[in-house]
């Protein structure tokens, strides 16, 4: 029987750091994300799905699953996807420039530049050539 683990220190450092960031993003989104907020039902359901994707992606990477890496990549892009869908649904009064700033995560309604930096760093870690080559060769 194969041992299941939550963290695998034997993967390249890009994937090891990505695992930690995925867990941190998932926990912080659950604690401080406002699941019961005043957003539309579609956004709240997509938000819950992205939290599950963060945790499942990190767990899948730790257990050497190709599906885990793929879900982690989708989860890493989810903040930008959620903000884009949110602008399509709720923010018709935004100008085009304000919508772009909101989707990127900066501006008066965005999540903040520091959060955006960590979102981009997670994407870079998962799509780094070392991470991609490792998952192609070793993940099942």
Q: Predicted segments — roles?
A:
Residues 1-140:
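Topology signature of small-to-medium multi-pass alpha-helical membrane proteins
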């Amino acid at each position: 029987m194969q041992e299941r683990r939550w963290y695998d220190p034997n993967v390249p450092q890009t994937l090891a750091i990505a695992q930690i960031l995925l867990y941190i993003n998932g926990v912080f989104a659950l604690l401080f994300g406002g699941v019961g907020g005043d957003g539309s039902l579609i956004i709240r359901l997509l938000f819950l799905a992205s939290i599950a994707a963060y945790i499942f992606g990190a767990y899948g990477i730790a257990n050497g699953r190709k599906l885990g890496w793929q879900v982690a990549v989708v989860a890493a892009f989810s903040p930008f996807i959620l903000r884009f869908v949110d602008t399509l649904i709720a923010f018709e009064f935004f100008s085009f420039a304000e919508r772009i700033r909101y989707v990127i995560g900066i501006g008066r309604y965005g999540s903040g530049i520091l959060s955006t930096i960590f979102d981009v760093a997670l994407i870079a870690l998962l799509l780094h050539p070392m991470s991609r080559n490792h998952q192609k060769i070793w993940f099942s």
